């Protein structure tokens, strides 16, 4: 009996010690001078943009594995408000909508996550992710400090925080960055609104991770907040140095990141499938990696916009196809493409001594 008690005491001690060590050994991510820092060491984000809503849940794990085998170290994803709150006050984060499960799957394969909760996300999605029922209030002004709009955004952000804030890196999860709004400079100029969205993101629980805002290089300064990281969006064929020129002038010590490097483009009904040359995409990524510039490849896998969730463009009304193939490295059906092979061969060169998983 005495030996058993001693054994149990020793077992409890080692379990307690192991828990303490696990807590003290948690990873860290921060924004340093000229570089991101992961566990205190320079880190280049190589992110794959994928959307959980456009991939049937049984295939989530496969697509994440494909991104890992490509050579990516991070997943980037939007949170689509209107699919989680299809009716006012009724939230659904189960099944296909279980974003926490998606992030945990990414962590299973050693991948970090960048979350982009909007509230507006664009993404060629119905109303840019904003719920239809907001328009029942006839005088509402979307993406402004409209009291009703901001009230509903706050409620939504709190629900997202319940799901994802526990998964921040500082909490033992894998979320390293969270975006505030989305390309707002192409919509308007309203720093008070952006500031309010930032505050809602923080109060929803995302107060242990880096916050950032993204925009095109031509207008990112219109709403840029001093306390947020700034990133720029551009696509295949762009002049890398020119895209970052203004940002480097304003913030010479900031880490550089292309938060959306467009691998292809979206398709409209009645038009030809959009494509972009694989060699141009790969060259653009090489140019960034040679400069230690982080990137998120939008899209790495586009998938399918199921149901009636496809959006449309204005002022010349033009609807999106249900296919969101995007001419991405991983095809709509989840297949390897020539883009995938070329990019994988490139990324191997920037991970000396690391063997990529088999495809």
Question: How would you describe each model-predicted region?
Answer:
Residues 7-17:
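Bacterial N-terminal signal peptides
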Residues 5, 20-74, 104, 110:
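N-terminal carbohydrate-binding accessory modules
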Residues 1-2:
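N-terminal secretory signal peptides that target proteins for export/translocation
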Residues 41, 78-90, 95, 123-148, ...:
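Aromatic- and acidic-residue-enriched carbohydrate-binding clefts of CAZyme catalytic domains
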Residues 60-126, 198-209:
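Aromatic-lined substrate-binding rim segments of carbohydrate-active enzymes
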Residues 49-51, 78, 181, 301:
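Conserved residues at the C-terminal ends of beta-strands
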Residues 24, 115, 119-152, 160-297:
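Substrate-binding/catalytic cleft of secreted carbohydrate-active enzymes
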Residues 153-164, 171-179, 190-194, 207, ...:
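Carbohydrate-binding surfaces of carbohydrate-active enzymes
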